[in-house]
Every structure is written in structure tokens, then in C-alpha cells.
């Protein structure tokens, strides 16, 4: 695909759903969109980041219909009107998608905020930093220590403990999976309708809160969903990223972006 005044390139890549940067040409050099672009010999007009912060699978379904969300997502506090997105998708040769984590993370963070009366910012950073990645007694102590530093009232501590350790996010994770199971087939179908020829890459998921069993199960199911959708649809490739490291905001670290880029490049059909 070539653009006006630009040299010809073999590929145009559009990346959807990972909110690396709001500006489609303003993403960091170290992010996976940039690294994949370089690996395919693309400049920034041809390696395009379409990720939007806080986007859920339902939001993406709406965006792929009209280029806009019909209303604000109240939990995430997001509202996007981005009709150019559809043009980029129509022109792309490779479309990578990772969306679904926010379906669980957004309501869970709101629930945690409500439980702590919004004293929970530091605890959230600890939970998604990766330091609690391995289930162990030491990490349970670390979690309890983090709760203690919040200076919660008795009622707040009880509500937070129930949410985090008493299965309080079970319903959130189940609803997130059900939403993704309904929406992700629509996402794939809408992408294919917009662009019949592009290779669609469904990126796998990493678990930002692996200490909690219900979250481990959720992301295992989301990965299975992505793999199943790829098997059911022509020219759709599932790319697992089990070892992508995440930072305190649940997004990939620099090394995580490099790992994801390498996984995508290996999956691209030459």
C-alpha cells in the first residue's frame, strides 16, 4: 500500500486496542507498533497505532461500525469519535488486535475504589506491577502489608478483603469473559467486512493480577477464545504472548514491547 508523496511499501500495519499512544503517529520508538513497523520496513505513516485508552470489546464493536462510540463508557470515563480508524483499517495489510483486558480491569478498579473510598491507588500499582506474579505466602503478606498502608477503616478493609481475597471479583471476571465471547467474534467479522484481504492477528493476553485465581482463569479463557476464533476464520492468526512483561500500569515494559513485536513479526505471512 502506498500513500500520496510516499514511497511504496509492501505492508501497511494497523494496530488496534493497545493504548500505547493516543496520536497514531506519536507512539514511542520502543513500542511494539514502531518495532513491527521497522521490522517490515515501514515508516510512521504506514505503521499505525489505533489503540485507545480504556477501550472495551463492546466499545470496539461500536467503533468498527461507525468510527464512534454511541455514548460515554461511564465506568471507564471514555468517549471516542475516530472515523479515520475505519479508513486505516481498510488500507491495512496486517491488523493486530488486543482488546478485552479492560472489560475486567475497569469494573474491578472501580469496585476497588468504591471498597476503599478511593484510597486504593498505591495498592492498584502493587497488584499490577508484577511483583505478586507468583502465588506464595510471601506475596500474600505483601498484599496484606499494602492493605495496611492504606489506613482503611474497619468497614473499608472488610470490603476490600472480600473483593480481593474472598472471590469478590468472580462475577466481574465472569461478566468480562461473557462480554468478550459475544463481542470478539463481531470484532473479527467487522474487521473482515472492512478489509477482506488483511491478515488479522489476535494477540494473546497476559495476566496483570496473577495472584488471584479468578483472574488467572479469565485470561486463560480469553486466550482460548482468541485461539478458537483464529482457527474458525481464514487469514486470522492467534499470537500468544505469555512472557510479555508488564509495568505498573498493566501495559508492556520496553522489553515486553520488544517481545510482542518479535512474536508478531514471526507470525506475519511473508
Task: Please provide the spans of the model-predicted regions.
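Residue-level marker of intrinsically disordered, low-complexity segments enriched
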Residues: 14, 34, 46-48, 70, ...
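Alpha-helical cap/lid subdomain in secreted, periplasmic
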Residues: 73-269
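Serine-esterase "nucleophile elbow" of acetyl-processing enzymes
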Residues: 1-63, 114-116, 253
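Short, flexible/disordered intra-domain loops and linkers
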Residues: 25-28, 63-69, 211-217
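Short, well-ordered amphipathic alpha-helices
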Residues: 32-37, 68, 186-189, 224
Amino acid at each position: 500500500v502506498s500513500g500520496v508523496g510516499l514511497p511504496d511499501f509492501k505492508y501497511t500495519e494497523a494496530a488496534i486496542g493497545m493504548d500505547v499512544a493516543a496520536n497514531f503517529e506519536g507512539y514511542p520508538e520502543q513500542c511494539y507498533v514502531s518495532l513491527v513497523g521497522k521490522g517490515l520496513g515501514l515508516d510512521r505513516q504506514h505503521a499505525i497505532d489505533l489503540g485507545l485508552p480504556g477501550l472495551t470489546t463492546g466499545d470496539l464493536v461500536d467503533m468498527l461500525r461507525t468510527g464512534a462510540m454511541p455514548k460515554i463508557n461511564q465506568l471507564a470515563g471514555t468517549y471516542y469519535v475516530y472515523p479515520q480508524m475505519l479508513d486505516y483499517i481498510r488500507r491495512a495489510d496486517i491488523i493486530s488486535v488486543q482488546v478485552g483486558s479492560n472489560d475486567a480491569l475497569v469494573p474491578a478498579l472501580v469496585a476497588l475504589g468504591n471498597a476503599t473510598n478511593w484510597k486504593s491507588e498505591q495498592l492498584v500499582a502493587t497488584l499490577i506491577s508484577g511483583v505478586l506474579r507468583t502465588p506464595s505466602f510471601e506475596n500474600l503478606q505483601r498484599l496484606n502489608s499494602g492493605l495496611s498502608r492504606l489506613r482503611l477503616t474497619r468497614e473499608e478493609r472488610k470490603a476490600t478483603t472480600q473483593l480481593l481475597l474472598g472471590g469478590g471479583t468472580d462475577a466481574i471476571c465472569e461478566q468480562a469473559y461473557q462480554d468478550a465471547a459475544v463481542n470478539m467474534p463481531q470484532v473479527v467479522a467487522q474487521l473482515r467486512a472492512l478489509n477482506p484481504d488483511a491478515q488479522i492477528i489476535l494477540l494473546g493476553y497476559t495476566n496483570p493480577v496473577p495472584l488471584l485465581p479468578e483472574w488467572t482463569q479469565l485470561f486463560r479463557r480469553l486466550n482460548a477464545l482468541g485461539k478458537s476464533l483464529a482457527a474458525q476464520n481464514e487469514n486470522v492468526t492467534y499470537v500468544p504472548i505469555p512472557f510479555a512483561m508488564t509495568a505498573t500500569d498493566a501495559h508492556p515494559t520496553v522489553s515486553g514491547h520488544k517481545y510482542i513485536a518479535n512474536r508478531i513479526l514471526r507470525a506475519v505471512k511473508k
